[in-house]
Structures are given as C-alpha cells and as structure tokens.
C-alpha cells in the first residue's frame, strides 16, 4: 500500500494507473447512477482529490451516507480525470470509513460561506475550512522561509526566555508570572506584595520582546535572531492587536541603521518570494475570495526598490498633502496608520523606510543622533498596511544609554546586565522587530489579525 498525500497525487509525478492510497476528510460528496464522487482533502494543498466509488464496492451504501468532515482511507488506481478543474482522480477499489460526523446537521463546518467572526468561535475546527487551511499553509511557508533566510545568511537562532524580569519596551504593559496565592498574598513590612516568596524570588513577567536578550548573543556571534512568542497586556480591542503573538527579531553587530534597513528589505523580499513560489494555489484562492491583489501586491513589493525618507521630511509632506487626516500631523508625534498608508500608497507608491524619529517617542535603547533630538530608528512601511517592521541602531555608548534610561525613569541597576554589553567590548549594532502575525495578515489580505494565528488571545478572550 503506497500512501501518498493529496498534493503528491495531484502533482503528476506518480505513474498513471498505479495503485495509491490517500487518507483524509470528506469535503463534499455527490452521487450519480451507481457512483459516488467524493472530494477528499488531507490539508497538504488547497485542492481536494476526487475519489470515484462505484456500487460494486461492498460498503457502497455506507459510502453514500458520507458527509462533510467524515474521515476515510481510500485506495485505488490513479488516473487522469475526465472532469474539469482537476488533473487526476482515484478510481476506488476500497473506501474505509474511519470516523463519522456525529450529527451532520449540527456540524459547525458546513459547505457554505461562513463569516470569520463565527469561525473564531470554533477556532478548533476552522482549519478545516478553505480559508483557514490556506492561511495555515501560508503561515507555515512564511515561518520556514524566515528560518531559511537567516540560516543562508549566516545567522544563529537564539532561544530567548519567555519568562523575564525586564521590560524591553519600557511601556509597563506586561503579564505577571506568579505562583503566589492571589487570595492570601504575602506582604512585606511596608505592606507591599513580598515577591521574594514567589517562585523566582522576584517579580517576573511574560516577555514583550526578546531583543535585549538576543543583543547579548549578537555581541559574541555577530549575526543572530530570535523567533518566538511574545506577550503584551494592552487592553486594545482592535483588528491589529493580539495579547499573544510571535516576533522575529534579528540583530547584527558592527552595523548601522543603513545596514539594518538593507537587511529588512532583503528579508521581506525573500519571504514574499518564497510564498509566491511555494503556495501559489493558496494565494490564487485568496486572490479570488479575500484580496484580489494577494498575488500582484507581493510581486510589486519584490520588484520595487524601497524609498528612504527622514521622519522630519515625512511630516512636512503630510502637512502639505492637501488632505484632512483623522489624527494630527505634527513634528514630535508618532505617525499613524493613515499617515503611513498615504506615504506608501498615494505619495510614493511603494515601500518606504522612515528614519530618524524624535527621541522621546522611541525606546530607550535606540541610538541618539548627533542632533540630540532624534534617534537612529526606522519603520518600514508597506502599501496596504502601514508599518510592518520597526528597528533601530542600538545605543552602544554607556554614558548616553544611562542618560536615556534616567530620562525614561528606568533603574539602571535593574538593567545592569544589559549595561555590561557597553562596558565590555561595545560595538555599534542594530536590529529590527517584526510581528509575525502582521506579516501573515499582509500576505493573506486578512482584515483582522485574530485570523492570522491558530488560537487568538485578546482582552476578554482566551478560549481553547
């Protein structure tokens, strides 16, 4: 018995007339004059394969009762299909039914249009749909391409801790990790919670970024990256925010902001090319049902050189855009999505790297420029979504870093280990961060980031 994937069976690389076995789930079934036409999918590709069963099979009456979602093993002869829209089909010599759908009428995944809102309520079943099957395969393709890009370019992957004592962003929006009894918290002499009696002997949190930790390895191995889960306790009920998501954070030694921007451009174009090359079937479906530009926007992105513009110049352009924005445009304020999209879509028409932001709106670790008013920071903006990458050259001068930490009200003793990098062989270095789900949203043309991750975590929502 040669078990093959549906993708392999449809690819035309197996001998026609050979015996094959496929295992999967029923997508649809229709009957006609002693025949049953079963569309079977195993998730290996977008298209199902048609299994043709005739009434000479001993369990044909049972086969006719199959419904969407039932699981089976079908064996038979692989032949060229006579029908339209598929290359090969299986003339079944046997169909073993492995699992029935208990009540087809109440089965949530029906062969009809279903809204993303409804499917979020049954997130454990939504990968069975065409949409989320496609999104999941594209997400996997992107993840594999991320690791492949960095591996091919000499980077080392670093596993940074999920449990941490440091706030890399300085925003204070962190999830606390504790084994203390919340009903009977231990108190110290001042009445505050005594975290010395907690599991780690101090306050600990879920990480908001692996950047500070990965810098340590950058300053020993030169080119590193981390790719893992991060957590933000932002009470944001928007289509752009998750409480749990994955971050890609490379870091390069002996590098400035210009090199950081080049790395970001090379990286994005590489992973987009991988999706176009490997997941054309899923992109074609998304272009038909979700975002008609799903393919063309990636091709345009890859072929366009990035435009670089200073933040100060971007503000001037926006102020003279002849357009009324919902959010004010003023030097010293961060750019909003509407501003970013105007720059990329209406003014420049391709990806944009905005550099040198005001120092007070960016993180403490970003390198202070000579003007004393801006930092060597960048945001990569993409048409259709706005910011997709944020990065900077890191502050390698200890005295300047200490001053920046004081400005942000951070205890430098708490960050003594991070300061050590500037005390022992400090070098210029840079890096960036990219929310993986934002990448998935952009590629798939999704309208809500909660559809870009298998089990979304958001304020008031932690199902499954």
Swiss-Prot record:
One of its GO terms (biological process) is asparaginyl-tRNA aminoacylation. Its main location: cytoplasm. InterPro entries: Aa-tRNA-synt_II, aa-tRNA-synth_II, aa-tRNA-synth_II/BPL/LPL, Asn-tRNA-ligase, Asp/Asn-tRNA-synth_IIb, NA-bd_OB-fold, NA-bd_OB_tRNA. One of its GO terms (cellular component) is cytoplasm. It comes from the Bacteria. One of its GO terms (molecular function) is asparagine-tRNA ligase activity. It catalyses: tRNA(Asn) + L-asparagine + ATP = L-asparaginyl-tRNA(Asn) + AMP + diphosphate + H(+). It is an enzyme of class 6 (ligase). Keywords: Aminoacyl-tRNA synthetase, ATP-binding, Cytoplasm, Ligase, Nucleotide-binding, Protein biosynthesis. The keyword Metal-binding does not apply. CDD domains: AsxRS_core, EcAsnRS_like_N. Its EC number is 6.1.1.22. It is found in: Cytoplasm. Belongs to the class-II aminoacyl-tRNA synthetase family. HAMAP family: Asn_tRNA_synth (MF_00534). Homodimer. This is Asparagine--tRNA ligase. It comes from Xanthomonas oryzae pv. oryzae (strain MAFF 311018).
């Amino acid at each position: 018995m040669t078990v093959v994937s549906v993708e392999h069976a449809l690819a035309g690389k197996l001998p026609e007339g050979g015996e094959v076995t496929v295992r999967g789930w029923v997508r649809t079934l229709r009957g006609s004059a002693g025949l049953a036409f079963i569309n079977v999918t195993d998730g290996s590709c977008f298209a199902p394969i048609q299994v043709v069963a005739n009434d000479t099979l001993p369990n044909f009456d049972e086969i006719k009762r199959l419904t969407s979602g039932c699981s089976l093993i079908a064996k038979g002869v692989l032949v060229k299909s006579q029908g339209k829209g598929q290359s090969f089909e299986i003339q079944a010599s046997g169909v073993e039914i492995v699992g029935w759908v208990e009540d087809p009428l109440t089965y949530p995944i029906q062969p009809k249009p279903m809204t993303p809102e409804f499917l979020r309520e049954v997130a454990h079943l939504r990968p069975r749909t065409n949409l989320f099957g496609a999104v999941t395969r594209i997400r996997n393709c992107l993840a594999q391409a991320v690791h492949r890009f960095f591996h091919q370019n000499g980077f080392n992957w670093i596993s940074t801790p999920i449990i941490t004592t440091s706030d890399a962003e300085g925003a204070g929006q962190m999830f606390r990790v504790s084994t203390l009894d919340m009903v009977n918290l231990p108190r110290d002499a001042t009445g505050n919670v005594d975290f010395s009696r907690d599991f780690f002997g101090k306050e600990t949190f879920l990480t908001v970024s692996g950047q500070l930790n990965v810098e340590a390895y950058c300053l020993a191995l030169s080119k590193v990256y981390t790719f893992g889960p991060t957590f933000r306790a932002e009470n944001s009920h928007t289509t752009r925010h998750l409480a749990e998501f994955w971050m890609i954070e490379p870091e390069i030694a002996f590098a400035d902001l210009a090199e950081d921007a080049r790395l970001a451009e090379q990286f994005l174009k590489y992973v987009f090319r991988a999706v176009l090359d490997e997941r054309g079937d899923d992109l074609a479906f998304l272009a038909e049902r979700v975002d008609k530009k799903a393919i063309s926007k990636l091709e345009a992105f890859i072929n366009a050189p990035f435009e670089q513009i200073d933040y100060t110049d971007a503000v001037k352009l926006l102020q003279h855009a002849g357009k009324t924005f919902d959010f004010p445009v003023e030097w010293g304020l961060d750019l909003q999505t509407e501003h970013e999209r105007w720059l990329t879509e209406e003014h420049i028409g391709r990806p944009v790297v905005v550099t040198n932001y005001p120092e007070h709106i960016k993180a403490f670790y970003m390198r202070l420029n000579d003007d004393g008013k801006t930092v060597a920071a960048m945001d990569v903006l993409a048409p259709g979504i706005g910011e997709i990458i944020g990065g900077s050259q890191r502050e390698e001068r200890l005295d300047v870093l200490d001053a920046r930490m004081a400005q942000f009200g951070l205890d430098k003793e708490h960050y003594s280990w991070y300061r050590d990098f500037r005390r022992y062989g400090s070098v210029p270095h840079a890096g960036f961060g990219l929310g993986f789900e934002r990448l998935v949203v952009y590629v798939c043309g999704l309208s809500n980031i909660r559809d870009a991750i298998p089990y979304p975590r958001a304020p008031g929502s932690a199902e499954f």
